[in-house]
C-alpha cells in the first residue's frame, strides 16, 4: 500500500491580496515569499483530504496559466473532491458534487470556470486566424456591421461576452468566490471576473414594479466580463434589465445548491433557469432544454433534494460525486455538547446569561486562534458581542439586517486577523473559509442537522483541527414528566404535530441523539471547567504574519482587561465618594426634615393654643353678653314690679292677640291690603326708639324695638312676648281693636318719633284716605265712617272724662291725643307713658287720659 500524501492547505484568503482586488498586483512579493516558505513547510492533516496516489494538479490536464495560479496559491496536490470533480467538470458533463466543508469545493468550480473561458478563448483565436486568411470585401462589410464586443472578438480573439454564471446564496459567499477566482487567475490574461451583489448603493432606487434599478457602475462592470458571480436577486435584476446576455452562457454553477433550492430562493432560481433556457433554445442539445452545462456543489444534500436537482440537469450526462453522504462532519473537529437545565425558567434571559457565563469560561480555557459563535436571534448576538467586548475580547457581530458595507468590513476584519471572535447568525454558516478559526460555539441549537454540519464546518478547514461546542436546553425532571403525560394524551388525540412544537426540551436532546444514531457523529458531553486537550484544536499557523497578528490581539486584550479594571476601580472610588456625599446629603436632609417637623408641630401646638384661647375668649364674651342681657331683663322686670301706681298690671299672652287678630281678619277679608299683624292698614314703621330722627309719618316697614339702636328691628331681648298693661278699673279696654276709641290701649301699635309726636296706625294722620280706610276696616264702629275729625272729637271727650292731671298736659301741650308727646318719652304701655324729661317732676309713670 502506498504512503498517503499530505496536502497543502487551501486558503488563498490568507494572503494580503485576498481582501481587495486592487491590492493583488501590489502583493506579488508577499505571495512569492509565502510560496517559498510553504515549500519548506509541512504539517499533519486529517485523512478526509488525503489520497493514496501521488498525483498533482499538473496531471489533471489544466491550462498552464491555471496551474501557475494554483501553485502560487499553495495548491500542489488535489483533495479527493478536487481529484474527482475537476476532470469531470472540464469534460463538460453536468455534475452534482457533495463533499465535506473545507475540502476545496470552491477551487473545483473555480478551476472549471477558468478552463471553460480559456477553452472558448482558444477556439476564438483559432477562428480569428482562419478569418484573417480569408478576408474579402464581403467579410469587411460584415465587420463594419458588428458591435464592439463581436468586432474585438473577431479581430483580436478576446472574448468579451459572459460565459460562466456562478450563483451563491449570500453576498459574503459571492465575494469570497470572486476573491478565490481572482487569486488563481492572475496569470490568465484578459479574463475578467466580477461580483454583483445588492446593498452597496446608497439609494435603493426602484421602478414602478418595485424592481431594483441598476446603477451605471454595475452596467460598466458587465462590459467584457466572462465570469459573473452574484446572488439570485441581483442576477435576476441584470437579466430583467437586459444587461446580462444569457444566449452566450456556456456554464451555470450553483454553490450551496441545497440552500438555493429551498423556499427562500427556489422561485428566483426557477425564473433564472427559464430565462437561460429561452436564450439558448437554438442550442437544444440536451433534455434540459438548453446547451448550458449545470454544476451543483454543497456539503449536504437532503434525500428529496437530489431528485429535485436532477430536473435542472442533463440526465444523459449527469454525474454524481458524493464523498460524504454518510458522515458529513470533518474528522479534525472534536464535537462537544453542554446541557443547561431549566429548572424554573424556559428559554428566557436568565438562561441566556448562564450560557454567556459558560461561554466566557470556554474562551478562557481554550487557546484558540479565532472563534465563531452562532446565535439564532439577532438581539442575543448583539448583547453577547457587547458583553465580550467589555470582557476585553476583540469581537464583532454580523447579521443579515446590517448594512452591506458593514458586513463586508466585518468579514475583512476576520480574514485579516483584526478580531478574534465573530458572533453571527446563520448568515456565515455556509461557505465562509477562514483557516485560523479553530473554535465554533453554537449558543443556540440550529434548526436542522444540515445547518449544524455547516456551522461546525467553519473550523477544521482543509484537514486542520478544531473544536465545536453546542449549548442545549433541557427541562427539569418534573417538567419532563409533565410533558410525557401531555405527549401521551396528544398521541391518543392524534395531535403529534402540536406535541413536537410544544416539546422544545426533548427536541434539543433528541437532536443530539439523532446526530449520534443517523450520522455516526462522535460527540461528547461536557460541563463547566472541563479541560479540552490542546492537541484537539492546536496547530501551527502556516503564515508567519498570523503569529504576529495573534500576539498583537492578545496584547490588546490584556491592555483592555487592565484598562477595564482601572475603570472599575475608578468607578468604585467614584461610587464610594458619591455614596459618602449622598449619605452626608441624606443626613443634612434628615436634619432639615427633623427641624421642619419640630417647627411644624410647634406651630400646630401654638395654633391649637390660640384656638383654645379664642374659644375661651368667645365663650367669655358670650357669657358676658348673656349676663348683660339678663341684667337688662332683670332691670326691666324690676321697673315693672316697682310701679307706684295702684293699677294692676298683667301680661297678655300672644294667644289673646292672635285671637283678636283672627277675629279682625275674618271680619275684614276684603280690606287686607297693606295690613300689619293686627289688621292695621299701614305702610309706616313701628318706631319705638325715642332718639329716631326721621320725618313725621315715615313708613319703611321696619320695627325698632330697642331704645338705643336706630333703624333696626330689635325688640328687647330681655322681654318675653308683648307686654300689655291693662287698667282693670277702667273700662277703656275694649274686646275688639276698633271698638277702642283710644288706640293707645294697644302698646304694640304705638309709633314714636323724634319730633315730639307719636302716631298710631289706625289714626295715621289727617288724610281723608287713611281715615276712610280705618273706618271701613272697623266693622263694629259705624259712627267712624265719616271722617277723621269725628274720631278726634270722640277721643277728646273720652280723654276729658279720665283726665286726672291737667297740669301735665299744660306743660307738654294741650293735645290729649298724643300728637305732641315730647322727645323724652322712653317707654309706654297702654294708658301710661314714662317721662324722662327734666321738666317732669315725678320721673315716673303718668297716666295718659
From Swiss-Prot:
Keyword field contains Hydrolase = yes
Name of the featured protein: Probable ATP-dependent RNA helicase ddx20
User: Which residue ranges does the record assign to the Helicase ATP-binding domain?
Assistant: 86-319
Identify the domain of life: Eukaryota
Job description of the protein: The SMN complex catalyzes the assembly of small nuclear ribonucleoproteins (snRNPs), the building blocks of the spliceosome, and thereby plays an important role in the splicing of cellular pre-mRNAs. Most spliceosomal snRNPs contain a common set of Sm proteins SNRPB, SNRPD1, SNRPD2, SNRPD3, SNRPE, SNRPF and SNRPG that assemble in a heptameric protein ring on the Sm site of the small nuclear RNA to form the core snRNP (Sm core).
Indicate the segments forming the Helicase C-terminal domain, all copies: 355-499
Might you give the EC number(s) for this enzyme? 3.6.4.13
GO terms (BP aspect): spliceosomal snRNP assembly
Give the family per the record.
Answer: Belongs to the DEAD box helicase family. DDX20 subfamily.
Q: Which UniProt keywords are listed? A: ATP-binding, Cytoplasm, Helicase, Hydrolase, mRNA processing, mRNA splicing, Nucleotide-binding, Nucleus
Motif, Q motif: chain positions: 55-83
Q: Describe its partners and assembly state.
A: Part of the core SMN complex.
Q: Which GO terms describe its cellular component?
A: nucleus; SMN complex
A Gene Ontology molecular-function term? mRNA binding
Free-text domain note: The Q motif is unique to and characteristic of the DEAD box family of RNA helicases and controls ATP binding and hydrolysis.
Amino acid at each position: 500500500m502506498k504512503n498517503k500524501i499530505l496536502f497543502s492547505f487551501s486558503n488563498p484568503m490568507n494572503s494580503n491580496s485576498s481582501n481587495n482586488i486592487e491590492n493583488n498586483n501590489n502583493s506579488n512579493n508577499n505571495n512569492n515569499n509565502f510560496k517559498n516558505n510553504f515549500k519548506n513547510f509541512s504539517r499533519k492533516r486529517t485523512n478526509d483530504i488525503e489520497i493514496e496516489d501521488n498525483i498533482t494538479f499538473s496531471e489533471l490536464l489544466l491550462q498552464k496559466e491555471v496551474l501557475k495560479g494554483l501553485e502560487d496559491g499553495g495548491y500542489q496536490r488535489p483533495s479527493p473532491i478536487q481529484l474527482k470533480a475537476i476532470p469531470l467538470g472540464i469534460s463538460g458533463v453536468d455534475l452534482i458534487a457533495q463533499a465535506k466543508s473545507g475540502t476545496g469545493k470552491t477551487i473545483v468550480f473555480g478551476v472549471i470556470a477558468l478552463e471553460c473561458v480559456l477553452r472558448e478563448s482558444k477556439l476564438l483565436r483559432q477562428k480569428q486566424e482562419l478569418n484573417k486568411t480569408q478576408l474579402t470585401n464581403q467579410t469587411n462589410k460584415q465587420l463594419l456591421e458588428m458591435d464592439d464586443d463581436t468586432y474585438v472578438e473577431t479581430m483580436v480573439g478576446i472574448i468579451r461576452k459572459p460565459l460562466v454564471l456562478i450563483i451563491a446564496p449570500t453576498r459574503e459567499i459571492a465575494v469570497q468566490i470572486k476573491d478565490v477566482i481572482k487569486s488563481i487567475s492572475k496569470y490568465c490574461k484578459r479574463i475578467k471576473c466580477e461580483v454583483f451583489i445588492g446593498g452597496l448603493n446608497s439609494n435603493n432606487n426602484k421602478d414602478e414594479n418595485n424592481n431594483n434599478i441598476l446603477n451605471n457602475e454595475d452596467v460598466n462592470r458587465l462590459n467584457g466580463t466572462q465570469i459573473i458571480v452574484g446572488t439570485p436577486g441581483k442576477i435576476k435584476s441584470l437579466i430583467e434589465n437586459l444587461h446580462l446576455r444569457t444566449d452566450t452562457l456556456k456554464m451555470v454553477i450553483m454553490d450551496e445548491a441545497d440552500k438555493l433550492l429551498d423556499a427562500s430562493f427556489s422561485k428566483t432560481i426557477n425564473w433564472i433557469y427559464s430565462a437561460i433556457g429561452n436564450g439558448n433554445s437554438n442550442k437544444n442539445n440536451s433534455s434540459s432544454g438548453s446547451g448550458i452545462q449545470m454544476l451543483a456543489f454543497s456539503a449536504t444534500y437532503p434525500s428529496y433534494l437530489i431528485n429535485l436537482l436532477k430536473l435542472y440537469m442533463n440526465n444523459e450526462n449527469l454525474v454524481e460525486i458524493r464523498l460524504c453522504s454518510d458522515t458529513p462532519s470533518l474528522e479534525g473537529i472534536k464535537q462537544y455538547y453542554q446541557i443547561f437545565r431549566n429548572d424554573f425558567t424556559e428559554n428566557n434571559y436568565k438562561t441566556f446569561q448562564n450560557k454567556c457565563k459558560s461561554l466566557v469560561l470556554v474562551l478562557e480555557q481554550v487557546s484558540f486562534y479565532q472563534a465563531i459563535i452562532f446565535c439564532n436571534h439577532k438581539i442575543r448576538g448583539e448583547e453577547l458581542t457587547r458583553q465580550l467586548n467589555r470582557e476585553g475580547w476583540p469581537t464583532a457581530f454580523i447579521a443579515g439586517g446590517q448594512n452591506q458595507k458593514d458586513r463586508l468590513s466585518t468579514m475583512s476584519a476576520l480574514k485579516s486577523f483584526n478580531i478574534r471572535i465573530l458572533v453571527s447568525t446563520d448568515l456565515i454558516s455556509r461557505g465562509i473559509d477562514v483557516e485560523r478559526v479553530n473554535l465554533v460555539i453554537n449558543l443556540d441549537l440550529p434548526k436542522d442537522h444540515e445547518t449544524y454540519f455547516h456551522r461546525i464546518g467553519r473550523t477544521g478547514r482543509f484537514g486542520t483541527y478544531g473544536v465545536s461546542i453546542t449549548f442545549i436546553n433541557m427541562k427539569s425532571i418534573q417538567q419532563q414528566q409533565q410533558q410525557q403525560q401531555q405527549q401521551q394524551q396528544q398521541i391518543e388525540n392524534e395531535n403529534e404535530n402540536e406535541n413536537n412544537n410544544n416539546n422544545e426540551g426533548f427536541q434539543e436532546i433528541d437532536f443530539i441523539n439523532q446526530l449520534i444514531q443517523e450520522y455516526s457523529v462522535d460527540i461528547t458531553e461536557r460541563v463547566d471547567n472541563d479541560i479540552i486537550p490542546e492537541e484537539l484544536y492546536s496547530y501551527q499557523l502556516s503564515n508567519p504574519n498570523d503569529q504576529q497578528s495573534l500576539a498583537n490581539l492578545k496584547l490588546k486584550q490584556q491592555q483592555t482587561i487592565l484598562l477595564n479594571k482601572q475603570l472599575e476601580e475608578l468607578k468604585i472610588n467614584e461610587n464610594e465618594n458619591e455614596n459618602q456625599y449622598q449619605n452626608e446629603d441624606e443626613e443634612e436632609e434628615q436634619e432639615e426634615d427633623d427641624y421642619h417637623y419640630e417647627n411644624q408641630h410647634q406651630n400646630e401646638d401654638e395654633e391649637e393654643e390660640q384656638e383654645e384661647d379664642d374659644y375661651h375668649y368667645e365663650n367669655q364674651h358670650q357669657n358676658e353678653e348673656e349676663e348683660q342681657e339678663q341684667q337688662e331683663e332683670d332691670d326691666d322686670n324690676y321697673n315693672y314690679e316697682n310701679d307706684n301706681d295702684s293699677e294692676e298690671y298683667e301680661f297678655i299672652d300672644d294667644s289673646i292677640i292672635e285671637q283678636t287678630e283672627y277675629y279682625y281678619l275674618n271680619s275684614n277679608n276684603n280690606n287686607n291690603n297693606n295690613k300689619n299683624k293686627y289688621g292695621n292698614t299701614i305702610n309706616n314703621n313701628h318706631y319705638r326708639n325715642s332718639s329716631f330722627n326721621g320725618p313725621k309719618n315715615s313708613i319703611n316697614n321696619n320695627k325698632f324695638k330697642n331704645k338705643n339702636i336706630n333703624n333696626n328691628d330689635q325688640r328687647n331681648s330681655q322681654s318675653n312676648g308683648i307686654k300689655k298693661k291693662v287698667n282693670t278699673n277702667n273700662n277703656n279696654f275694649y274686646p275688639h281693636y276698633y271698638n277702642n276709641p283710644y288706640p293707645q290701649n294697644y302698646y304694640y301699635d304705638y309709633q314714636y318719633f323724634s319730633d315730639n309726636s307719636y302716631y298710631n296706625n289706625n289714626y295715621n294722620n289727617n288724610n281723608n284716605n287713611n281715615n276712610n280706610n280705618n273706618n271701613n276696616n272697623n266693622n263694629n264702629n259705624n259712627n267712624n265712617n265719616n271722617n277723621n275729625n269725628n274720631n278726634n272729637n270722640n277721643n277728646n271727650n273720652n280723654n276729658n272724662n279720665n283726665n286726672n292731671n291737667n297740669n301735665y298736659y299744660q306743660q307738654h301741650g294741650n293735645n290729649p291725643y298724643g300728637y305732641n308727646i315730647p322727645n323724652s318719652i322712653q317707654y309706654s304701655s297702654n294708658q301710661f307713658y314714662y317721662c324722662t324729661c327734666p321738666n317732669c317732676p315725678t320721673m315716673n309713670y303718668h297716666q295718659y287720659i
